Amino acid sequence: MSSYQSEFNADEQAAIDKEFTRLANNKSIYLDHAGTTLYAESQVTAAAEQLQRDVICNPHTCRVTGDYVDQVRFKVLEFFNTKEDDYHVIFTANATAALSLVAENFDFGRQGNFHYCQENHTSVLGMRERVQARAMYMLKEEEITGMASLPSAANGVDGSSPGDNSLVTFSAQCNFSGYKIPLAAIAGIQKQGLAHGLGKRVSGEAPQTTDNNNYYVCLDAASFVATNPLDLQRYRPDYVCISFYKIFGYPTGVGALLVSRRGAEAFRKKRNFFGGGTINYAYPHAMDHQLREVFHQRYEDGTLPFLSIVGLLEGFRTLGRLVPRRSDVATMERISRHVHGLAQYLEKQLRQLKYPNGQPLIELYNRVGYEERHRQGGIVAFNVRTDAGPFVGFGEIACVAALQGILLRTGCFCNIGACQRYLGLDETMMDAIYKRAGRICGDYYDLIDGQPTGAVRVSFGYMTRRQDVDELLKMLQLSYLATKPQQRLQLIEEQAGELPKALKERAQRLRPQLLQLAIYPVKSCAAFKIKEGGGGGGAGAGRTWPLTAQGLQYDREWMIVDMNGMAVTQKRCSELCLIRPLIRDDQLVLHFGDSPAGVSLPLSLADQAENSSRCRSKVCRQPVEGLDCGDEVALWLSQHLGLEGLRLLRQSSQRSASNGVRQQQKLSLVNQAQFLLVNRSSVRSLQFEESLDETVDRFRANIIIDTGSAFEELSYKQLTIGQVQFQVEGPCQRCDMICINQRTGERSPETLTTISRLQSGKMRFGIYISRISTENNKEQQHLTCGDVVVVT
């Protein structure tokens, strides 16, 4: 194990441990300090004793309460190394409310712009709904970081010049990755503004010029100040937004907006709303009122959460007592060193976790590494991969962690911009995740077509121990490096009752599921697809499709033959893939490409037989008997495929399996087995430039599933999908048919060569399966998209 040097001596560590015995009592390991840190037990005891001892009432009634509030205001300024001559302290509900206050009251003038960092908390994006700027721009993190290197980026500015005002908002520390934007950028922005062309305009009109604009900085410091010192004598943002529960753990419901003297000048002189305590007077009979002269009093609407504010005093005292200044290193500096040391230790250990085949277990999300504390905080974000490379969903990690008492965070952490940046999500992928797939913030839909929609985050506080980090590492080692996927999923299912409600729902989706059914009514033509969200009517209903003795109802029941009675396949005519079937209203309708015109056939075999002649052909050297479907469809096929003498034949009698497959199996016009199953994880490993759906289509499978590991289906012997049992007949040996793009008919040879490389020269992809004969087979059985796949 890599070395780790503790920041705290033995006595200090013992005192800290004594304050958090509830963790051991509840068998919990807490690793989400970026969400909130934990309160010390003596802290809340002292706060409760004060409430029992003192009379603390409405500050408008009781001067003592007002004095307490003023003490807290002074402690806040002292905590950030500033004084009331330089900054005002406005108490708010939280950092989000502080950001909202800035958005509502900042005076942009006519030409002012709103700029914000992509890697920001959702609340910063919410500011866009309230700011009255001419235009809004999204900045990359490096565009803001670049302002720190300007020669003028020194101690900021004290005032402003005539002109309009632009506002730049960014986080001091990214709550997703822990990356710290250099605070020297504050002065660079204030003095130099932003160069023309920086950022992506997302709203409004581009101003004619911003040369005369004053630039102000709003610093979202909620994540940063929880474990780092913020020196407002050295760095002077115009607005600082914080939440105290992230620093002390208790109380919740109180934050603050710190406003510099310069920042106060850029606030509007008139508010859109005022509450009690913010005015000198207000007439009910006329539109006349006057705001308070004291700046912070103008914006603290209504009665302050005075009990919570008074409780902050014990938070300051507890933090200073448990992590005292030592050798001229202040409390928050020591906490910063402690959490960074833990993050650095964890990052090194995670990089060493590998599967026996050498595949790394962990994908880390970080900008600059963990060597420099001034650039990286006590946060580690990552995802887990399988031994074949695909990602494991963060919801599964959350389940595994919860069952072992490890509390961590998963998702995007209310920072969709950071998710977009670190996960490499372009605009098309964002739409696929949030609009088409329907993911919402806070859910556990963690993988969409193998692409992670979020990550796992662990973060540290002053009470986090190295042993806690080691328990996380142990969990990852035992659950992923030393346990097979099926064993892990079984364990989660067995203990799912112990999970929180949201994770119980995610645990139910850990097993592989039936994602899609593909029915190929006409052999070698396109598929009629049944998938999550709806099918196509006809025999199927929504996501469900019936089974027959031969397989999926109507699958490969028709085939096209030439004038010699020989089956026409894509090997001879690749344009067959452009014949697209639709099953509805007791009709099979065939279309060519995107043409709305088509030709219809009855689904009823009895109706077909009345007006059809019998004919014979062969499938895989086996004779088949069928019914000729008539001249109309024959002419339509010849016209669209450019081949004369084509006929459409419908199977009229059953055929049995041969060529190594069990003799009792009844077949349609398929080549070898009743069903062909393909695993999207295996398809994903091919990594073609085309969309995953296009590649899946190449393999012309009936049953499409998605599992945790690529090619694991090749080891299956039997499986159950929903209530239907299947026997694996063997792997599908591929030919050059899979080189045909099923949406265009174009050929590309790399499909075969890639499979050959991945399978050590073998052309295997997908597996043949057949339904096992049981008593249930005597009744109509169905497959439904969403059915759980259980390997037995």
Curated annotation (Swiss-Prot):
Domain MOSC residues, every copy: 646-792
Q: Which of the residues bear the PTM Phosphoserine?
A: 748
Keyword annotations from UniProtKB, A to Z: Molybdenum cofactor biosynthesis, Phosphoprotein, Pyridoxal phosphate, Transferase
Q: What Enzyme Commission number(s) appear in the record?
A: 2.8.1.9
Q: What class of enzyme is it?
A: transferase
> What are the recorded Gene Ontology BP terms?
Mo-molybdopterin cofactor biosynthetic process; molybdopterin cofactor metabolic process
On whether Lyase is a keyword of this UniProt record, the answer is: no
Q: Which InterPro entries match?
A: Aminotrans_V_dom (IPR000192), MoCF_Sase_C (IPR005302), MoCo_sulfurase (IPR028886), MOCOS_middle (IPR005303), PyrdxlP-dep_Trfase (IPR015424), PyrdxlP-dep_Trfase_major (IPR015421), PyrdxlP-dep_Trfase_small (IPR015422), Pyrv_Knase-like_insert_dom_sf (IPR011037)
Function comment = Sulfurates the molybdenum cofactor. Sulfation of molybdenum is essential for xanthine dehydrogenase (XDH) and aldehyde oxidase (ADO) enzymes in which molybdenum cofactor is liganded by 1 oxygen and 1 sulfur atom in active form.
Stated family: Belongs to the class-V pyridoxal-phosphate-dependent aminotransferase family. MOCOS subfamily.
The cross-references to PANTHER family, in alphabetical order and at most eight, read: MITOCHONDRIAL AMIDOXIME REDUCING COMPONENT 1 (PTHR14237:SF19), MOLYBDOPTERIN COFACTOR SULFURASE MOSC (PTHR14237)
Protein name as it appears in the record: Molybdenum cofactor sulfurase
**Source organism per UniProt:** Drosophila pseudoobscura pseudoobscura (Fruit fly)
